[in-house]
A protein has these predicted regions:
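Interfacial juxtamembrane loops and adjacent helix segments
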Residues: 71-168, 327-334, 342, 353-373
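Transmembrane-helix signature of polytopic, membrane-embedded enzymes
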Residues: 159-162, 183-206, 244, 478-479
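Perimembrane helix-loop-helix junctions
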Residues: 5, 233, 239, 266-300, ...
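Membrane-interface transmembrane helices that cradle and orient dolichyl/undecaprenyl
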Residues: 191, 230-248, 256, 278-280
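Membrane-lumen/periplasm interface segments of multi-pass, membrane-embedded glycan/lipid transferases
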Residues: 314-404, 516-536
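Membrane-interface alpha helices of multi-pass inner-membrane proteins
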Residues: 245-261, 266-269, 301
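Transmembrane-helix motifs of polytopic, lipid-linked glycan transferases
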Residues: 167-191, 229
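Transmembrane helical bundles and short interhelical boundary loops of multi-pass, membrane-embedded
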Residues: 291, 370-379, 476-561
Length: 561
């Protein structure tokens, strides 16, 4: 009796120690993850104090969509008759523009950066009948993200229209941060080892283009946040929550589709990922089929109104301007085959994937500093090659014959299924980019596909990268991925602090740069506060390091107990 009692007590102590370590590790993870999300948001003051209004890609078009909804309370139809509302003209011509954006609103009186700083800004007093309004080509997009922005624009458009732009930009950053919270939860399952997990999350939070893509007036932030949330909810599903998580994932993916058509690439991720996650957790086949069918049906019901509206107005459910133009020009198959044959693949791969562009200087398309760009190119290629080798090694280990009695732990099966979901997200997003490149090449004679279209899948690519490196060595994965995150910080700071002010202010005089930038920003983002903004950004990174030190000490103390 005494021996049995002693064994039971020891067992309880052992189980309690394991639970204590798990709880301590989870607390440490959420501390560091929270600090990294704060570091993500802490980049906003400096970046937004530099980034001019309408320098975001197609930003005046996206604001025009919002103003159209505000004026008419109807969804704009993509056609030659749908024009950018004149309500935004006073704000547009009061600001300088990039060449790409300025050419479109030149008839309104808009000036380039160089002309703007050397000539008085035009006024809105010009007779409105003497010029035409640009076509609202962003009417190709679904309305959800813009509908969320309408209250901000409506409240501020009369007295603080410039403030409305920065309020919408800030809201978009907060939406992306919410998506990052769910991704942090999914990382606990995808990356069981703490250090590589932190390195992956740092990559995402510190990636320059991931931030730039959402720090503008556009529909990308909501599409990205809901897309990442949907995939993360799939990864977090288990036997008990499969249906609930599947339905929430379907709702998130539907919201992503209602925001931007890049969300269409996530439909197969849901249909394939949900049964895969359930199968890894031992869910019976019958229940897998039922849950997948229910989730797919809910997704269809949520998206059906958008597709019916699109089909009624365009005769199609994919309504990108390239697809509509291609269909209007006649037979499609021959043009697509010719486009596929003549598409310039090397520049496309270089721009989108290897090495890709981790930083893009707004609609002016400012290039990265050459040394940093070269270093990033070599570093990224080496990491991809090493991760590919590690992935092959991991698969060979998994396929190696083992004794029948040996079973794979449930947590490893769940992680493997989660990695398959990550791979599906990356693969189908890449296929979507290729489709867009082929179609746009057929219509315009060149690919119009941009690297920021990949941003929803980017976090899951980083997971695959780190797990491939982990298969070689866990410490190698942590150091290599952490080094890339540090390089991202250098690229981002140099671009924001050096490249952008010089280009947008059209001068090499540092004092004049910030003075000019202050004149086209709200007072709260004055260039006079730039040092405070820089300290805020760097201070957030210091807090992340302090959090890592604390987590490391906490882990050692827990292990010692």
């Amino acid at each position: 009796m005494t021996d049995d009692s002693t064994v039971s007590e020891r067992s309880d102590v052992g189980v309690g120690a394991v639970i204590s370590r798990e709880q301590s590790g989870s607390r440490a993870w959420w501390l560091v993850a929270g600090l990294l999300i704060i570091a993500f948001l802490a980049r906003a003051p400096l970046y937004l104090s530099v980034f001019p209004p309408f320098e975001g890609w197609d930003e005046y078009q996206h604001l025009g969509y919002i103003a159209y909804l505000d004026q008419t309370s109807t969804i704009p139809v993509f056609s030659t008759a749908t024009r950018v509302p004149l309500a935004i003209r006073p704000l547009v011509i009061a600001m300088p523009h990039s060449r790409w954006g300025g050419d479109q609103v030149r008839d309104w009186g808009a000036l380039s950066y160089g002309d703007f700083w050397n000539a008085p800004a035009p006024t809105a007093a010009t007779d409105r009948g003497s010029f035409s309004s640009p076509r609202l080509y962003q009417a190709q997009h679904p309305p959800l993200a813009y509908a969320l922005d309408v209250p901000i624009w409506h409240a501020l458009k009369r007295k603080h229209p410039l403030g409305a732009i920065y309020a919408i930009r800030t809201m978009n950053l907060l939406l992306a941060a919410i998506g990052l919270v769910l991704f942090a939860g999914a990382l606990e399952r995808l990356m069981p080892v703490f250090a590589p997990r932190v390195a992956v999350f740092a990559l995402v939070c510190l990636h320059p283009l991931f931030f730039q893509n959402v720090a503008r007036v556009a529909n990308d932030a909501l599409a990205l946040a809901t897309g990442i949330a949907g995939i993360s909810l799939l990864v977090l599903a288990d036997r008990r929550t499969l249906l609930t998580q599947g339905l929430m994932a379907a709702a998130c993916i539907a919201a992503s589709i209602w925001s931007k058509q890049t969300g269409l690439t996530l439909i197969p991720v849901l249909v394939l990922g949900l049964p895969l996650i359930g199968w890894a957790d031992g869910v019976p086949a019958g229940r897998l089929c039922r849950v997948t069918a229910i989730a797919a049906l809910v997704l269809l019901l949520l998206v059906a109104p958008l597709w019916l509206w699109s089909y009624r107005h365009y005769g199609a459910i994919i309504t990108t301007q390239e697809s509509l133009q291609l269909a209007a020009d006649g037979p499609v198959a021959g043009k697509l085959l010719s486009s596929l044959e003549h598409l310039r693949w090397p520049p496309l791969i270089d721009t989108l994937f290897v090495p890709g562009r981790p930083w893009v200087g707004g609609w002016s398309f400012l290039p990265m500093q050459k040394s940093l760009a070269d270093l990033y190119g070599w570093y990224w290629r080496i990491l991809l090659a090493a991760a590919a080798v590690g992935g092959v090694v991991a698969m060979l280990r998994r396929w190696r014959p083992v004794e029948p009695v040996v079973s794979v732990p449930r947590v490893l099966s769940q992680a493997a299924a989660g990695l398959a979901v990550c791979a599906a997200a990356v693969i189908f997003t890449v296929l979507g980019l290729i489709h867009h490149a082929v179609v746009s090449n057929a219509v315009f004679g060149q690919s119009m596909t941009n690297p920021w279209y990949f941003m929803t899948a980017l976090p899951f690519l980083f997971v695959l990268l780190a797990r491939g490196l982990e298969a070689i060595n866990s410490r190698l994965a942590t150091v290599a991925v952490g080094g890339l995150a540090a390089l991202f910080v250098a690229i981002d700071l140099h671009g924001t602090w050096v490249e952008m002010p010089r280009a947008y202010a059209s001068t090499t005089d540092a004092a004049l740069q910030w003075s000019r930038l202050a004149s086209i920003h709200p007072a709260i983002l004055s260039g006079d506060l730039r040092w405070l903004f820089l300290v805020t950004q760097l201070g957030a990174l210091v807090l992340v390091v302090a959090g890592l030190v604390y987590a490391s000490r906490s882990a050692r103390d827990t292990t010692a107990q």
